[in-house]
A protein has these predicted regions:
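Bacterial N-terminal signal peptides that target proteins for export
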Residues: 1-12
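C-terminal segment of classical bacterial N-terminal signal peptides
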Residues: 15-26
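Immediate post-signal peptide segment of exported/extracytoplasmic ligand-binding proteins
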Residues: 25-36, 69-78, 164-171
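Beta-alpha junction/loop-to-helix N-cap segments that form part of ligand/metal-binding clefts
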Residues: 31, 46-53, 65-140, 149, ...
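Extracytoplasmic "Venus flytrap"
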Residues: 35-58, 82-88, 111, 176-184, ...
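Extracytoplasmic ligand/sensor domains, especially the bilobed periplasmic-binding protein
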Residues: 101-204, 254-276
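Extracellular/periplasmic periplasmic-binding protein-like sensory domains
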Residues: 243-315, 325, 379-389
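Segments of small-molecule ligand-sensing domains
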Residues: 301-310, 322-381
Length: 390
């Protein structure tokens, strides 16, 4: 097949690759290459680094256990990872390179705006994509080979019911999010949901990802006197600055991120006390189930320091390995068929792909989602909730 690729050559030539194992292009007789396009530098690196590392660790462990058996033949799993810096042009360039130069047929892309920019390329080249991304229309019948591997706002907004039950004093919500596909859709879903629960939406603001001075936006938000500020879809670097500057302007309320954010990174920027009481999805430091403690030890041994974001960002690799085993094929379409039926273990328990009633296709990962509250500087698990559909 001739790859159809977008012509973003300046970014293409500037892309930096990290390759685990063999550097041969294409699929060697005994190698399955898995492409990763993710931010390994910049404000979103606290997402991208554990995304790459978690995938690499799971593949290394599968290889050490005898590699992946497909119809009696052993295959070694390898990753080819590129840094897109959460810049759309870089994201397009890295995916182009993975498909055309590296010959990968299996991908995991992080970032809604980046995934949306690559939809056509992924679909036309018949590539299986297991992204970590928020964007409207991403999980859709028009993207049959895209299996979203992290809970999205239609799933995670259910935590607002928990808040309403446990903290009835909170009445008004303000939101601040990136000015792109990821931010627009995330806030649209979240604000519609909270309004349905009776909350007042005091303000909705968007920012460019390069912004570091949030005071003008925050002054508009704080003038509306919200009880809580949602920073959904915002990366840790931006969230730290938002919280720091909001506190300096006198905001005393809570913050919430029902996407995913590393609160330790946020606290290093904003100050530990300023993050106290924040609620987050998908980032837990304590208490950890036994299987997560084991993962923590293995991850720390390999990479030198622990990163709790890796817990949920391991999902694409878990899903891929389970589906290949079930499909007994390296055909992306057959692996996709297997993903519709296979139940697999992730670090929080059992997971599968579902959500057909909501999305029109069963391509959204479903599992018991962890939510935490920062208490004494530690992201402490307060609830595990199931999505509103199966």
């Amino acid at each position: 097949m001739t790859a159809r690729l977008a012509p973003v050559w300046a970014a293409f030539l500037g892309a930096t690759a990290l390759v685990a194992g063999s550097t041969q292009s294409g699929l060697a007789a005994d190698v399955i290459k898995f492409g990763i396009s993710t931010p390994l530098s910049g404000p979103a690196a606290p997402w991208g680094i554990p995304h790459k590392n978690a995938t690499e660790l799971i593949f290394d462990e599968a290889n050490a256990q005898g590699e992946l058996d497909v119809n009696g033949k052993k295959y070694k799993l390898e990753i080819v990872a590129y840094d897109h810096k959460y810049v759309i042009a870089e994201g397009v360039a890295t995916v182009n390179r993975l498909i055309a130069k590296d010959g990968v047929k299996f991908l995991s892309i992080l970032g809604g705006a980046v995934v949306k920019a690559n939809e056509e390329t992924v679909n036309e080249n018949g590539v299986l994509n297991l992204p970590l991304a928020y964007a409207e229309g991403l999980v859709s019948p028009k993207n049959p080979l895209t299996f979203h591997s992290f809970p999205a706002p239609p799933e995670t907004t259910t935590f607002w019911k928990w808040i309403k039950e446990h903290h009835p004093e909170i009445k008004s919500v303000a939101t601040i999010a990136p000015n792109d596909d990821t931010g627009w859709w995330s806030i649209k879903i979240e604000t519609n949901f909270v309004q349905g629960l009776g909350y007042q939406v005091a303000a909705k603001e968007f920012f460019e990802r390069s912004v570091t001075d949030f005071n003008p936006v925050l002054l508009r938000i704080l003038a509306q006197k919200p009880d809580i500020i949602s920073v959904n879809a915002s990366p840790a670097g931006s969230v730290g600055l938002i919280i720091k500057q909001a506190r300096e302007l006198g905001f005393k309320g809570r913050f919430i991120h029902i996407g995913q954010v590393d609160t330790s990174v946020v606290a290093n920027i904003s100050g530990k006390a300023n993050v106290e009481g924040m609620w987050v999805h998908g980032y837990v430091q304590n208490p950890l189930p036994e299987q997560v403690k084991s993962w923590q030890a293995r991850y720390t041994e390999k990479y030198g320091e622990w990163n709790a974001t890796s817990i949920d960002f391991a999902n694409p690799a878990f899903a891929f390995v389970a589906a290949v085993k079930k499909a007994q094929s390296l055909d992306p379409k057959k692996i996709a068929e297997a993903l519709h039926t296979v139940e697999f273990d992730n670090l929080w328990g059992k997971a599968h792909f579902g959500g057909k009633d909501y999305y029109g296709i069963a391509n959204q990962i479903i599992y018991s989602m962890p939510f935490s509250e920062v208490k004494d500087g530690v992201a402490t698990l307060v609830a595990q909730l199931t999505p509103p559909y199966n």
